[in-house]
């Protein structure tokens, strides 16, 4: 009789855990027990509860790091320390630079066991995640005056370098407006010389203004030399073409 009762109790227990609902409840219990995933807080050295991470990469419980920042800020009022520091690496930390970690799409509301009492401190709610529309958790430039000064100095250096580059670009004759005008003038003069050489009329040019380059020629020896070289080159080209034409007439 006792053996039959034991078998029925074992069968009932097995069927209870074998159902999907029983498995789901057991899995939820395991998840709630291991919500921290095995990571420990660097202050209380216990399984992390409401985890937050600093910009320097250290993991803390939100109540622990809030108390730490609170006591550091209170003690800094009576000393020269300006901002609370990380307990591990002594980097500057604040509530704005803490990044909350929300696992499995929610927040654990189960109170942590073994935590120190609040000591009269009202711990606010953990900051919202940036992904959920919270405020951006990067440190502002106003909190660090030295970085702000370095940034401004870099901007001033970049602004002083930019006109130098622009001056080097403008010094190029091809990019400056004056250089472009001079190049256009040279090409127009060479074109007029070629037009006059081919058609044998030095008084009529390809433009509506005859002798439009006489002033430039008379005022610039360099222009005179370039035009004379162009004239000789055109003469040689015309003579070569004439010889080719005569040769073609003789042979064909």
Curated annotation (Swiss-Prot):
Pathway assignment: Protein modification; protein ubiquitination
Triggers of expression: By drought, cold, high salt, wounding and ethylene. Not induced by abscisic acid.
Bias (Polar residues): 140-162
Subcellular location: Endoplasmic reticulum membrane
One biological process term in Gene Ontology: response to osmotic stress
InterPro entries for this protein: RNF5/RNF185-like, Znf_C3HC4_RING-type, Znf_RING, Znf_RING/FYVE/PHD, Znf_RING_CS
Catalytic activity: S-ubiquitinyl-[E2 ubiquitin-conjugating enzyme]-L-cysteine + [acceptor protein]-L-lysine = [E2 ubiquitin-conjugating enzyme]-L-cysteine + N(6)-ubiquitinyl-[acceptor protein]-L-lysine
PANTHER family: E3 UBIQUITIN-PROTEIN LIGASE RNF5-RELATED
Oligomeric form and interacting partners: Interacts with Arabidopsis PIP2-1.
Role played: E3 ubiquitin-protein ligase required for aquaporin levels regulation.
Identification of the protein by name: E3 ubiquitin-protein ligase RMA1H1
């Amino acid at each position: 009789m006792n053996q039959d009762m034991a078998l029925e109790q074992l069968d009932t227990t097995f069927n209870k855990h074998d159902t999907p609902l029983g498995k789901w409840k057991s899995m939820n219990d395991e998840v709630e027990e291991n919500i921290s995933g095995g990571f420990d807080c660097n202050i209380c050295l216990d399984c992390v509860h409401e985890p937050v991470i600093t910009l320097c990469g250290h993991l803390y419980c939100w109540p622990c790091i809030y108390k730490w920042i609170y006591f550091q800020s209170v003690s800094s009022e009576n000393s020269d320390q300006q901002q609370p520091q990380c307990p591990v690496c002594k980097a500057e930390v604040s509530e704005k630079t803490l990044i909350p970690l929300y696992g499995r799409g929610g927040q654990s509301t189960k109170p942590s066991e073994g935590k120190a009492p609040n000591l009269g401190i009202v711990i606010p709610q953990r900051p919202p995640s940036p992904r959920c529309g919270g405020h951006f958790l990067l440190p502002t430039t106003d909190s660090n005056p030295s970085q702000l000064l370095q940034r401004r100095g870099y901007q001033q250096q970049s602004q002083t370098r930019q006109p130098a580059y622009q001056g080097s670009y403008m010094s190029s004759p091809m990019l400056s407006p004056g250089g472009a005008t001079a190049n256009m003038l040279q090409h127009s003069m060479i074109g007029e010389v070629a037009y006059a050489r081919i058609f044998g009329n030095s008084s009529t040019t390809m433009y509506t203004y005859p002798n439009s380059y006489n002033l430039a020629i008379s005022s610039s020896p360099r222009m005179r030399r370039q035009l004379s070289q162009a004239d000789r080159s055109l003469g040689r080209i015309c003579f070569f073409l004439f010889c080719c034409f005569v040769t073609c007439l003789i042979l064909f």
